């Protein structure tokens, strides 16, 4: 089933100039980038996005970190995109992430773990709508999809 997922490269990925390397992993897997924007996330958007963590002790430092520098917000589409992206991203704690995953290869700390990816269809829809207007998402066909999907 073709799905859309929200993915965000966090400030540490942007500051460390890892955006191109990370983007290429999604494209090499056969996923399609349908929206992307480099943005400075303000405190209100950060608190809304991470609202589920509001009562946790790390919430303040998470908001401070995510608003400290630009992030790269994306919508990525493909066959079973949500689970495929989660596998590419790796475990939340980089020390538990397998080598070969984005976090396993590039991150060292749970608080600075490079990337966020939607964990379910519901969260993908909510996060996409939070960061993108409908007219910012491109619907286009990749000519080699016939070689990737049956």
Curated annotation (Swiss-Prot):
It is found in: Cytoplasm. GO terms for molecular function: ATP binding; metal ion binding; nucleoside diphosphate kinase activity. HAMAP family: NDP_kinase. It comes from Methanobrevibacter smithii (strain ATCC 35061 / DSM 861 / OCM 144 / PS). It comes from the Archaea. ATP binds at residues 10, 58, 86, 92, 103, 113. It catalyses: a 2'-deoxyribonucleoside 5'-diphosphate + ATP = a 2'-deoxyribonucleoside 5'-triphosphate + ADP; a ribonucleoside 5'-diphosphate + ATP = a ribonucleoside 5'-triphosphate + ADP. This is Nucleoside diphosphate kinase. Its cofactor is Mg(2+). Keywords: ATP-binding, Cytoplasm, Kinase, Magnesium, Metal-binding, Nucleotide metabolism, Nucleotide-binding, Phosphoprotein, Transferase. One of its GO terms (biological process) is GTP biosynthetic process. The active site is at residue 116. SMART domains: NDK. The lineage of its organism: Archaea, Methanobacteriati, Methanobacteriota, Methanomada group, Methanobacteria. One of its GO terms (cellular component) is cytoplasm. Belongs to the NDK family.
């Amino acid at each position: 089933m073709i799905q859309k997922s929200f993915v965000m490269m966090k400030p540490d990925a942007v500051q460390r100039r890892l955006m191109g390397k990370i983007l290429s992993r999604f494209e090499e897997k056969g996923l399609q980038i349908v929206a992307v924007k480099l943005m400075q996330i303000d405190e209100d958007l950060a608190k809304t996005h991470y609202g589920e963590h509001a009562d946790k002790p790390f919430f303040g430092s998470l908001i401070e970190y995510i608003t400290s520098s630009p992030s790269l917000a994306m919508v990525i589409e493909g066959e079973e995109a949500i689970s495929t992206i989660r596998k590419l991203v790796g475990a939340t704690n980089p020390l538990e992430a397998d080598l070969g995953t984005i976090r396993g290869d590039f991150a060292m700390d749970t608080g600075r773990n490079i990337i966020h990816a939607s964990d379910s269809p519901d969260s993908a829809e909510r996060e996409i709508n939070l960061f993108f207007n409908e007219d910012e998402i491109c619907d286009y066909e990749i000519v080699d999809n016939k070689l990737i999907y049956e």
